[in-house]
Every structure is written in C-alpha cells, then in structure tokens.
C-alpha cells in the first residue's frame, strides 16, 4: 500500500510539473498576443496619421504650378506606399494572432487535461490514505483484542 502511495505521489508531482509547463506556455503565448495587440494599435495610429496627411495633400480647386503638382503626387505616392506596407504588416499580425489563438486553445485543453489528471490522482491518494488508516485501525483493534483475550485467559 505504501508503495502504491509513493507511485501516486510521483504521478501527482509529474502532473503538477506538466500543469506548470502548460501555465508557463500559456503565459508566454498571452504575452506574445499582448505584444501583437500593441503593435496593431501603433499601426492603427500610424494609419490615421498617414490618412490625415493624405487628406491634407488634396488639391481642392487651388491654382498650383506644375512642379507643385508633381511634388504633391510624389508625396501622395510615398504616403500610399507607407499605408500599403502598414496594411501588409497588419495582415501578418492578424495571421499570427489566429495561429496564437489556436495554440492558446490547445494549451488550455492540455492544461485542463493535466488538471483533471492531478485531481484524479489526489482523490486516489486520499482513498489510499483512508484505506491505510482503516487498515492500521483494524490492525490496532486486532492487537488490542489479542491483548485483552490473552489477559482473560491468564485469569
């Protein structure tokens, strides 16, 4: 029985280690997800800024020189290129976030698995301890009965 108890204790330690590894992995994934969200917020701010620059570059019925038109067109092209690059980066972030969400779901399932195993082993340990206690009490009762019967026969 004690050997079984030591095996169960080993299993409990192993499940606790696996559970801790899952927790660490989840924390790492959530931290990465937070960084992605922060990057996306920064890109959104940049997009708003670039869009406002683009809006300011519109020629609204103004009389301008040809060189000013070309200068404005170059500026607009640069701004549009920057907007396209930021949108591409945002797409990459969205794809990475999808992957992270899948990994998080997998890790949560793994964590639940190890937590349930740990609970099962804890219940088993309690049951074994209870059986050991009952066995010891029964053994003690038998010894007491033998002592009592031994004294009775001597008298």
Predicted regions: what they are:
Residues 1-155:
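Charge-rich amphipathic alpha-helical interaction elements
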């Amino acid at each position: 029985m004690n050997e079984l108890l030591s095996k169960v204790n080993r299993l409990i330690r192993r499940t606790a280690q696996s559970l801790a590894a899952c927790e660490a992995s989840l924390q790492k994934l959530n931290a990465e997800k937070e960084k992605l969200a922060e990057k996306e917020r920064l890109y959104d701010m940049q997009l708003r800024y670039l869009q406002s620059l683009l809006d300011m570059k519109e020629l609204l019925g103004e009389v301008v020189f040809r060189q000013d038109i070309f200068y404005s067109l170059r500026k607009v092209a640069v701004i549009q290129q920057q907007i396209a690059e930021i949108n591409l980066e945002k797409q990459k972030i969205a794809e990475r976030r999808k992957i992270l969400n899948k990994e998080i779901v997998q890790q949560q399932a793994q964590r639940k698995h190890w937590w349930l195993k740990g609970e099962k082993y804890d219940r088993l340990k309690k049951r074994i301890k209870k059986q050991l206690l009952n066995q010891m009490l029964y053994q003690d009762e038998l010894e007491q009965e033998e002592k009592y019967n031994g004294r009775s026969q001597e008298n």
